[in-house]
Amino acid sequence: YVSWNWKAGTTTGIAGSPSITPLGYSFNATSGFSAIKYEGTGSAGTLPHGLGVAPNMIIVKALETVENWAVYNSPRGATKYIELNHDGSEGTSAVMWNDTEPTSTLFTVNTNGGVNTSGKDYIAYCFANVKGFSKVGSYIGNGATNGVFVYTGFKPAFILVKDATSTANWILFDNKREGYNANNDILRADTDAAEGNSADLDILSNGFKANSNWASINKSGATFIYLAVAEEPLVANVGSGLPATAR
């Protein structure tokens, strides 16, 4: 088994003027992570995230109804959505995020059942980029065995990758299940499949690199989104962002 864990924090500090009052929440602006439980209203509304900066990824799940996991990511923007439990490409619809980018205090949900059915409970997980700790970003695959290098500014311990523009699994890498390069022990977040070894990926001191032309992480011309979290949540010099050393 493997477990990945995020610590939130304070249960005070709602900022802005949200139109939907959370049922419960935990904010950690230092690590750029928060969790918010809320009851849907069935109409477009705003919720607090407590991060002090606009979140770069938001994952929402209905708790009482059968709905897909809805994902917002800043590289693709609020006109798009993608589903964590499916391998499909991103969709375009205003009914998810109301075509409204998150602000430093609030994020918006519209009327889609995956994010805002009246009287039903939801949980939202928000992630903001923090230098030396976490990063949401995107890259373009090159389809070569000498694949793309992705700069994060830190040595990742956890990497979640999805081809946003094609049918492809959500691919998970970490530094515990194999622990050395090339890291090819993968899990697929959108299936119940056992661990596989389809890819070669190097975890480096300042990012990660695909050493494979495997389409799920390096399809030529495809746009990939990712969430990466650091092994050591620090930098040697905050101003210049010097990363921790390689393994």
Feature locations, PLM:
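Surface-exposed molecular-recognition determinants
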Residues: 1-247
